[in-house]
A protein has these predicted regions:
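Disulfide-stabilized extracellular ectodomains of secreted/luminal proteins, especially beta-rich
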Residues: 1-208
Length: 208
C-alpha cells in the first residue's frame, strides 16, 4: 500500500477575496454541494474541483434596505443556510438575503440551475448570518430551528403550518441551535440555552 503524502490532500478554499462562511455540505451522488456567501458550489468528490456553481445575489434594493437599518455591509449579503434535494431534479435553497430571508426551488440540469419558484423564508432561515440555525427534511416536510425576526429575539421551531409558541421562554429561552435529526416518528432538535436554575450564573444547559 502506498503511503499518502501532501500531494494526495485536496483543498477547496472558495472565494479568496472575502470570507465565504461555509455552513452547509450536502452530498449529491458523486458531488458535494457547499453553501456559502451568494453561492452554492458543486464540487467533485474525487478531487474537490468545482464542477458547477449556483449564484444567488440579493437585489440592490434588498441590500440598500439592509444597510439603511444600520447593518454592516458584510452581513447584507446572501448567506446560504438550507440546501435540500427535494427530488432528483429539484434543489431547495434558503438564504439570509440581506436580512430578508428567501427560499427558492431550483431545477437541476446538466451545466446549469433554473429558478422554479421563490417564496419568503421567514421561520425557515435566519435573518442574520451569525445566528445558528438547523433544519432536517423528512418525508417531504422541512423542519427548522431558527429565529423568525430581524432582531433575533423570536426563536422558533417550525414545520409549516405548525410552530412553537411565540416569545414563550418556557419552550425556548434564547436557544443556540446546534443540530436536528429524525428518528422513527420523531424529529429532535438540539440546542443550548441559559438554564433557569442558573439564570444569574451565566450557565448554559444543553436541551433536546
Amino acid at each position: 500500500m502506498r503511503q499518502r503524502g501532501a500531494e494526495d490532500v485536496f483543498r477547496f478554499t472558495g472565494n479568496e477575496t472575502h470570507t465565504d462562511y461555509f455552513r452547509l455540505v450536502l452530498r449529491d451522488g458523486n458531488y458535494l454541494l457547499v453553501g456559502g456567501r451568494n453561492l452554492v458550489h458543486n464540487l467533485s468528490l474525487t478531487d474537490l474541483t468545482e464542477q458547477q456553481r449556483l449564484t444567488w445575489y440579493s437585489t440592490d434594493s434588498d441590500v440598500k434596505m439592509c444597510l439603511v437599518k444600520g447593518t454592516p455591509e458584510e452581513n447584507c449579503q446572501n448567506y446560504i443556510r438550507i440546501l435540500v434535494k427535494t427530488d432528483s431534479n429539484t434543489l431547495l435553497v434558503c438564504a439570509t438575503n440581506a436580512f430578508k430571508p428567501m427560499c427558492r426551488d431550483y431545477g437541476v440540469h446538466p451545466g446549469n440551475y433554473t429558478i422554479l419558484k421563490e417564496k419568503g423564508g421567514q421561520a425557515m432561515c435566519p435573518y442574520d448570518p451569525r445566528h445558528n440555525s438547523t433544519f432536517v427534511y423528512v418525508d417531504g416536510e422541512l423542519y427548522t430551528g431558527t429565529v423568525a425576526d430581524f432582531a433575533g429575539m423570536d426563536p422558533i421551531i417550525y414545520r409549516e403550518p405548525l410552530q412553537t409558541e411565540q416569545y414563550d421562554s418556557k419552550s425556548l429561552n434564547a436557544p443556540n441551535f446546534v443540530s436536528s435529526m429524525a428518528q422513527g416518528d420523531f424529529v429532535y432538535f438540539f440546542f443550548r440555552e441559559t438554564a433557569v436554575e442558573y439564570i444569574n450564573c451565566g450557565k448554559n444547559q444543553r436541551r433536546n
